[in-house]
Regions:
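Short coil/turn segments at secondary-structure junctions
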Residues: 13-17, 64-67, 71, 128
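Surface-exposed helix-capping loop/turn segments at secondary-structure junctions
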Residues: 36-44, 93-96, 149-150
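Hydrophobic pocket/interface hotspot
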Residues: 33, 45, 80, 117, ...
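Short, low-complexity N-terminal intrinsically disordered segments enriched in polar/charged residues
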Residues: 2-39, 43, 47-51
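A beta-strand edge to alpha-helix "cap/lid" segment located at domain peripheries
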Residues: 2-11, 98-101, 106-161
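Short helix-to-loop capping/linker segments positioned immediately adjacent to catalytic or ligand/cofactor-binding
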Residues: 33-35, 88-95, 128-131
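A generic "alpha-helical surface" signal
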Residues: 24-27, 71, 78, 135
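A solvent-exposed, acidic/Ser-Thr-rich amphipathic alpha-helical stretch
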Residues: 51-120
């Protein structure tokens, strides 16, 4: 099993033809994933993950120092569900909309069971009575598994600048 490389560059271990076959699957996944989040359907977010998933948001500086302490850490779909419910039902935040923009995914590895991919993202936030601002930017480092014809995230490491 390949581990996710969270900093620096490593060449893809997938040839161009195979990467071209896998890229549309990962793109479709990411488009649907962001559509759920951007539409405010936060409680549907955990369905994109396996039961034994890992989800973490970490600053690039921490990732480069191999100190994956981050803003968010969730292990398992139930933990993601708790987080999603807390976010969707809290009243402590001003009303806002979020908009994700993603690069094309880079397929970095595959072993028959998993697909490893990276994708740059920018997250914009618009408060009801304010301008749109850049909220976060960085890279998704993903481990996908197949669930029939669909993909699920076994691991998503969100490294932000």
């Amino acid at each position: 099993m390949m581990t996710l490389q969270l900093s620096g560059y490593a060449p893809s271990r997938v040839d161009a033809r195979r990467a071209a076959e896998l890229r549309p699957l990962v793109e479709h996944f990411n488009i649907e994933y962001c559509a759920v989040l951007d539409s405010g359907h936060i409680e549907e977010w955990p369905r994109f993950f396996t039961e034994d998933c890992i989800y973490r948001i970490t600053a690039r500086e921490n990732a480069e120092l191999d100190m994956p302490v981050g803003l968010v850490y969730a292990e398992g779909r139930p933990m993601l569900h708790d987080r999603a419910v807390a976010i969707s039902r809290t009243q402590m935040f001003a009303p806002r909309t979020m908009t994700h923009l993603l690069s094309a995914p880079r397929i970095v590895g595959e072993d028959g069971q998993e697909i490893w991919a990276q994708c740059n993202y920018v997250l914009f936030q618009t408060l009801v009575e304010g301008p749109t601002t850049l909220h976060l930017a960085g890279t998704y480092h993903d481990r996908f598994v197949r669930d029939g014809d669909e993909l699920l995230l076994r691991e998503r490491q969100v490294i932000h600048e």
